[in-house]
Amino acid sequence: MSLNDLNTLPGVTAQADPATAQFVFNHTMLRVKDIEKSLDFYTRVLGFKLVDKRDFVEAKFSLYFLALVDPATIPADDDARHQWMKSIPGVLELTHNHGTERDADFAYHHGNTDPRGFGHICVSVPDVVAACERFEALQVPFQKRLSDGRMNHLAFIKDPDGYWVEVIQPTPL
């Protein structure tokens, strides 16, 4: 479908309000049961960098902010890093409610079973075949391998809470 056709779909505002010209999609948030397992997955498996952490002791939760960025671009100064983090796209916020990791029966709903809701996040990689081979070697659980189904150009892996992470490459296979 052409961009022109996309802009004529019902509900689409083709000419955005100029007031939104500098808006940036900054982050999305996932609630996680075991922060150590989640940090390991997102930093070791997917290469995210932990760029900030905020603790709310009285409310018994912590926020962890991760991004796929060159570590050299992360400001060392706390205030500068807070400002920088608010300006970059694609930040992943992990919310950990303290104590959930010790409750064997506790689980968050990932949204891909009934009742359906949230679906997935997506990470773009330079070589999806090599990335999937690495995920296999790391024993990362797959929801969909490249060889599953007709869409053999993408895969879905699962994080420790069962959230799906789509894996694609920007160029054709």
From Swiss-Prot:
The active site is at residue 166. Keywords: Lyase, Metal-binding, Nickel, Zinc. Pathway: Secondary metabolite metabolism; methylglyoxal degradation; (R)-lactate from methylglyoxal: step 1/2. It catalyses: (R)-S-lactoylglutathione = methylglyoxal + glutathione. Substrate binds at residues 31, 97, 116, 120. It is an enzyme of class 4 (lyase). InterPro entries: Glyas_Bleomycin-R_OHBP_Dase (IPR029068), Glyas_Fos-R_dOase_dom (IPR004360), Glyoxalase_1 (IPR004361), Glyoxalase_1_CS (IPR018146), VOC (IPR037523). Its EC number is 4.4.1.5. It holds the Pfam family Glyoxalase. Its cofactor is Ni(2+); Zn(2+). SUPFAM superfamilies: Glyoxalase/Bleomycin resistance protein/Dihydroxybiphenyl dioxygenase. CDD domains: GlxI_Zn. Residues 24-170 form the VOC domain. Monomer. NCBIfam families: glyox_I. Belongs to the glyoxalase I family. This is Lactoylglutathione lyase. It comes from Pseudomonas putida.
